[in-house]
Amino acid sequence: MDMSLLSFHSEGKIEAGLDEAGRGCMAGPVVAAAVILPPNYKHSLLNDSKKLTIKQRELLRQDIIRDALDYHVAEVSHTVIDQINILNATMKAMHKAVKGLKKQQPNLLLIDGNRFKQYTGIEHVCIVQGDGLYLSIAAASVLAKTHRDSLMERLAKEHPEYGWDVNAGYATEKHRLAMETHGLTPYHRTSFHFKPKQLDLF
């Protein structure tokens, strides 16, 4: 059985895959990436992106940046998240990622998840678990995650108690205990609530 991811959703369209990283985190920004891949693009690692090691993901990031027809990674800060809520902040990050595409203008956006706010009249399709179905979304997932992980590793040097170099700001036990012991840093989201809904907005 062929488990390869799909190269396109609608033949003849210029498709940009979109995904985010950090939606369910207690600290740091939400990051979104938009990627336009060449037609019929294939990459062996991208077919198994959920099982990648950190080293493989970094190598894949370099290949995507080299091979993509266009890509852009965008951040929305924790302060903006607190102002407009995480769902709106995620949409804002995705819109910024699409706006940042300069070499190619997509006419179809493939969105990982089941919600998206229309962007400047460009057609879009929401696909639950799309990073496991379409190469462009999987590529966007890799770029968003590696960008955000790198950022959180840098912030971890300022606040090593919270383990952000390992947990990337997610609500792990170590992170929660550090918050109880040391309080909030300037990078924490004050709007975060420890509720399952926070992690299931899509």
Curated annotation (Swiss-Prot):
Domain RNase H type-2: 13-202
GO biological process, one term: DNA replication, removal of RNA primer
GO molecular function, one term: RNA binding
Keywords: Cytoplasm, Endonuclease, Hydrolase, Manganese, Metal-binding, Nuclease
EC numbers on record: 3.1.26.4
Cell compartments where the protein resides: Cytoplasm
Reactions mediated catalytically: Endonucleolytic cleavage to 5'-phosphomonoester
Name of this chain's protein: Ribonuclease HII
Primary role: Endonuclease that specifically degrades the RNA of RNA-DNA hybrids.
Cellular component, GO annotation: cytoplasm; ribonuclease H2 complex
Organism of provenance: Cytophaga hutchinsonii (strain ATCC 33406 / DSM 1761 / CIP 103989 / NBRC 15051 / NCIMB 9469 / D465)
Similarity section: Belongs to the RNase HII family.
Gene name for this UniProt entry: rnhB
